Regions:
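Bacterial N-terminal signal peptides that target proteins for export
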Residues: 1-11
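Bacterial N-terminal signal peptides
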Residues: 10-20
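Noncatalytic scaffold domains of N-terminal-nucleophile
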Residues: 26-61, 73-74, 78-238, 243-245, ...
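Alpha-helical support elements that line or immediately flank enzyme active sites
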Residues: 66-67, 153-161, 238-245, 250, ...
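Active-site rim segments in enzyme catalytic domains, especially the processed small/beta chain
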Residues: 86-111, 262-264, 404-472, 502, ...
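Short, small/polar residue-rich loop motifs at catalytic or cofactor-binding pockets
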Residues: 275, 389-392, 414, 463-465
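Internal maturation/activation junctions in enzymes
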Residues: 311-411, 423-424, 439-440, 448
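Extended C-terminal subregions enriched in glycine
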Residues: 438, 459, 492, 501-549
Length: 581
């Protein structure tokens, strides 16, 4: 029987007033659950000295080579990030932004925010039409859609503070790939045909790079990017100033000025990547570190884990109706809170302490009825004291000393705006769509935002990107993350729960079918692979089940007690690779 809803409000009111709850101390981290079966269904890649997991085989090899040359995990991560800007242009980028989570061999965990920023001339209603309704063409495919890019600044900050190799060395592999070219693989060919065709043919600079004889490049064609190679050479020689104050800045600002965009040289010169304190929590004795705002991921992963801690997930079992019901109901509440409270922390007060408090989670858990789903129409954000495509991309790196890096970055939708800035070879993002063009109206991924995420100058839009590091007994245990827009949070959540509660190795946790609920729309989205009987049970309990396409593309590394590395790339993607030595 559900406890009265007002208990939740009492708990929240106390938190907002500065009150405290006595919460039982977390037990030491238990070993992952064992089912007494020795044989694994899926086998991870194994290495001892270093490992890289990314969506592209060429980029993964670049990272492994940097590790072999004596670079640490940060050096390798930056090299992979620049390489993906060449080999995976649908999401890898210089003209976008993202987040990095890193944990040093000494146990320091930190977050680097290089999310795009709204230009100084941005205004709250800039994406509304004459009738006051959101105009997706403005926020997705026009020059107005681009925020000031952060990738180059973020990589530079990470390398300067935590790397060991010079920028010139880690950028060289990307320069070579851009200058000499590489063979187009299945993933790029398919995305150019499916998504690129919607935006790239509208812009001659872009078409000249990715089209041949009037058609998108096909598998087996060679992609050479001479202009991008020159831009990378400028960055290698002159550092981030080449991008934010030098000739690349000139190209971007000129492209904007000629086509009605807002980014100016002043916007570029003022951009700074920011190092932030990670969001942290505990789950059954494991420590969980993830991104703080402007990512909503860290807060809500911890929030949902806190709710699940009140249930015996291991006893329920993976793929059971009970486990899926509890997780779906927890996800609904978290996404409702997201819509109300999450935004850019430099502009709005984000009540992260209340949202991640275990007493608040207990009040939510007490409301969940395992036998009856609560309609989303009856769920409101807690009275506390809120969007990327599948072509966001994530990569993970761990080195021989135990340094670990998780990076998720993006252009937003596939190939961003499709606009290449002048002769820079750099595709520009359409990240401005991640703001709430009109609070209460869903964005391109169906996510609803409030006033906290409204458009405003110098603001960074809310994101679901959730690079995450899990620590066991003081040592890095799992490094993970995923693309997937609104489904990033639940994809990463299931990697953690599959590993801890259901005793899966990293490959099994990656391969397991996934599900997702984001409050609105009121739909439990599931991949193929769950028992039809289970889905019928969920429908009988009030869930509106819909079998949909694959979700996410995790790139994960697990560290064994002896330091051995076990990695897995997601089979939902093609041409990705986990490798080590």
């Amino acid at each position: 029987m559900m406890k009265p809803t007002f208990l939740r409000w009492v708990a929240i009111a106390a938190l907002m007033a500065g009150g405290t709850f006595t919460v039982a101390a977390n037990p030491p981290a238990a070993p992952p659950v064992s089912y007494g079966v020795e044989e694994d269904v899926f086998h991870p890649v194994r290495a001892t000295h270093g490992m890289v997991a990314s969506v592209d085989a060429l980029a993964t090899q670049v990272g492994v080579d940097i590790l072999k040359q004596g670079g640490n995990a940060v050096d390798a991560a930056v090299a992979v990030g620049y390489a993906l800007a060449v080999t995976h242009p649908q999401a890898g980028n210089l003209g976008g932004g993202g987040f990095m989570m890193l944990r040093t061999k000494d146990g320091k965990t930190t977050a680097i925010d290089f999310r795009e920023m709204a230009p100084n001339q941005a205004s709250r209603d800039m994406f509304l039409d004459d009738q006051g309704n959101p105009d997706s063409k403005k926020s997705l495919t026009s020059h107005l859609a681009s925020g000031t890019p952060g990738t180059v600044a973020g990589f530079s900050l990470a390398l300067e503070k935590y790397g060991t190799l010079p920028l010139n060395k880690v950028v060289q592999p990307a320069i070579k790939l851009a200058r000499d070219g590489f063979v187009v693989n299945d993933a790029l060919a398919d995305d150019l045909k499916t998504y690129g065709s919607e935006v790239i043919p509208n812009h001659e600079n872009s078409k000249a790079i990715f089209w041949k004889d009037g058609e998108p490049l096909k598998k087996g064609d060679k992609l050479v990017q001479k202009d991008l190679a020159k831009s990378l050479e400028l960055i290698a020689e002159n550092g981030p100033d080449a991008f934010y104050k030098g000739p690349i800045a000139d190209q971007i600002a000129d492209e904007m000025q000629k086509n009605g965009g807002l980014i100016t040289k002043a916007d570029l010169a003022e951009y700074k990547a920011v190092e932030r304190e990670p969001i942290s929590g505990t789950y059954r004795g494991y420590e969980v570190f993830s991104m703080p705002p402007p990512s909503s991921g860290g807060i809500h992963i911890v929030q949902i884990l806190n709710i699940l801690e009140n249930f015996d997930m291991h006893k329920f079992g993976f793929g059971s109706a009970d486990a899926m019901q509890v997780m779906a109901e927890a996800e609904k509440r978290a996404y409702a809170d997201r819509s109300e409270y999450l935004g850019y922390p430099d502009f709005v007060k984000v009540p992260w302490q209340a949202l991640t408090n275990k007493a608040y989670a207990k009040s939510i858990a007490d409301e969940i009825d395992i036998n009856k789903a609560k309609p989303s129409s009856e769920i409101r954000p807690g009275k506390l004291a809120p969007y990327e495509s599948n072509q966001t991309t994530h990569f993970s790196v761990v080195d021989k000393d135990g340094n670990a890096v998780a990076v998720t970055y993006t252009l937003n939708t596939t190939f961003g705006t499709g606009i290449v800035a002048g002769n820079s070879g750099i595709l520009l993002n359409n990240e401005m769509d991640d703001f709430s063009a009109k609070p209460g109206v869903p964005n391109v991924y169906g996510l609803v935002g409030g006033d906290a995420n409204a458009v405003g100058p110098k603001k960074r839009p809310l994101s679901s990107m959730s690079p995450t590091i899990v620590v066991k007994d003081g040592k890095t245990w799992l490094v993970t993350g995923s693309p997937g827009g609104s489904r990033i949070i639940t994809t990463v959540l299931q990697m953690v729960v599959n590993s801890i509660d259901f005793g899966m190795n990293v490959a099994e946790a990656t391969n397991a079918p996934r599900f997702h609920h984001q409050w609105l729309p009121d739909e439990l989205r599931v991949e193929k692979g769950f028992s039809p009987d289970t889905l019928k049970l969920l429908e009988q309990r009030g869930q509106k089940v819909a079998v949909k396409e694959a979700m996410g593309s995790t790139q994960s590394i697990m560290v064994g007690p002896d330091g051995a590395l076990f990695g897995a790339s997601d089979p939902r993607s093609v041409d990705d690779l986990t490798a080590g030595y």
